Amino acid sequence: MQIQEHSVPDRLAIAITSMARVGEKIYLGLTGGSRLLAIYDISTGVISMASEICPWIGARGYCGKFHNAMGAMPDGSLILGECSHLTWEGLPVTANYFRTELPERMLARKREQGFPDVTYTDFCLPDLSLWDRRKMDPGGRVLRYFPDRDIAEEVCSLPPFLYSQSLLVDSQRGRAFGHTIPDNHFFDVDLATGKLTDHGRISDYAFHQMVLAPDGTCYGAWIDRADGAMKLLKFDPEERRLRHSSRLILRDPGSKIAGNQGIDHWLVARDGTIFMGTVANSLLWRFDPTTEEFTLLGRLAEGGRVTSMDEDEEGIIWISAGYPHTHLVRFDPSIEGPQAITDCGPINPNLERCYIHASCLHKGKLYLGETDGFSPSLHIVDLSSISKVTP
């Protein structure tokens, strides 16, 4: 497997948590400081930084992010959902949290990227003793970024204290759908008018991101506390009602991995087929929105997580799966049974942890954005370097 690695040239960037391609530019949504957007130029192989599109982040002392919250519009602009770097309890990440989740030795890669003196408190508060939620975390914004002018304009604000933990963009119909941290609310946005509608709390967190079916319906999941099962969540933008369906996905959503539980990632293939991967056990499913039924296709990797899926020109699905070290997995939908799934190995076996969060595929190359290692790295896999697999 031939892989190139490029790092984002910004001191405060520590992860790539969203990605979208427009032409020959790949836009990288970051976890970092006030410059939360970087651009990879495919033709030159260079990553550059966009302007300071979130200047209000710079003064507070901890990261913001675009987390599964980026979508391209027909005119080439980007819709972005702002998030704050919060724990699942809705509190800012602190040095104590980092010591638990990311040992200080993991700062070594960031230091090697040209920032030799970085410390935990470049990216987080030492503790919460001086934190003021109303002043420092008043709530996020939905932004529209215009690459030709390198500026961002506000589309709308989220309700007080809430941030976009995900944001799906329906560019065809001019709408966006998201969920929040804290409190896991569902919301939708009319992008033409900037009107945001908050539909209230969903449940305990049950997905890393949602999916848009070809007909514009948005699907996710919710956890029923009565029996602990994970069930289908559905929002029809024409009906304008959030439905907590009784359709069972899993009787047990499984353990939390890196704080996530339930559904991890979705892909809508070119032919309209919808695939879904789960956090626990890295399970791959096919979802039929007509019947709202899930079919188990197999297990992708050890350790859990399915954090990205991309379809190539031949209909092969390339998947990032496994934790704490992501493997690249090849899935051929035309083959029935376990032989459809091939583990192509770890993304970068020389690292202690290489954990992928965002991706896109273009002209035979897979672009993978790394997270949870203090390294905002873009790993580029030449898929032609991977031996063809025959049934």
Tell me what each language-model feature is:
Residues 6-12, 51-62, 155-161, 199-203, ...:
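Surface loop/turn motifs at the tips and blade-to-blade linkers of beta-strand repeat domains
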Residues 13-18, 59-70, 161-169, 204-213, ...:
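Repeated scaffold domains used in trafficking and secretory/extracellular systems
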Residues 21-23, 72-75, 170-173, 212-215, ...:
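Residue-level detector of Asp-centered blade-edge/turn motifs that repeat once per structural unit
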Residues 26-29, 78-79, 175-178, 218-220, ...:
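Conserved beta-propeller blade signature
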Residues 31-32, 83-85, 181, 223-225, ...:
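Short loop/turn segments immediately following the C-termini of beta-strands
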Residues 34-39, 87-97, 137-141, 184-188, ...:
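Structural motif
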Residues 83-137, 223-225:
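Short, conserved, GDST-rich strand-edge loop motifs in beta-rich repeat architectures
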Residues 352-391:
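Blade-level signature of beta-propeller repeat domains, shared across WD40, Kelch, NHL, RCC1
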